[in-house]
Swiss-Prot record:
NCBIfam families: L17
Biological process per Gene Ontology, one example term: translation
Transmembrane regions listed in the UniProt entry: none
Subunit structure, as described in the record: Part of the 50S ribosomal subunit. Contacts protein L32.
Organism: Rickettsia conorii (strain ATCC VR-613 / Malish 7)
Family statement: Belongs to the bacterial ribosomal protein bL17 family.
Keywords: Ribonucleoprotein, Ribosomal protein
One GO CC annotation: cytosolic large ribosomal subunit
Protein name: Large ribosomal subunit protein bL17
Pfam families in the cross-refs: Ribosomal_L17
The keyword Ribosomal protein belongs to this UniProt entry's keyword annotation: yes
GO function term, MF aspect, one: structural constituent of ribosome
Amino acid sequence: MRHKIKGRKLNITSSHRQAMLANMAVALVTHEQIKTTLPKAKELRPYIETLITKAKKADLMVRRSVLSKIKDKTAVEKLINILGTRYKDRPGGYTRIIKAGFRYGDLAPIAYIEFVDRDINAKGNIQQDANEEIKN
């Protein structure tokens, strides 16, 4: 019986699952919207929401705690400095999941997970900067 067992297995090992959630959290913090399967999005939501709730404090202990989870310094900086201040007055519910149909190959349910008050320009900034460097 699965009484009081939280989370989904996603048919992968626990270390793979933790690494996948950390990588997806970095991608979500960087781009503020990502497309993934619906079960992965549902697993990512509580993971990222606890990180944002911690980041609202913005002290050294929180910085180290968040860095131990996601292991990317630029994502931690953005999480604490930008997202922590953006959601300072919001008591929770920082993300939304939007269902986006089914994947063509295997009919897996696809969803977008995004921040509620996201910066629309955040998704394209990295590609625009890369294109400018190539032209120069």
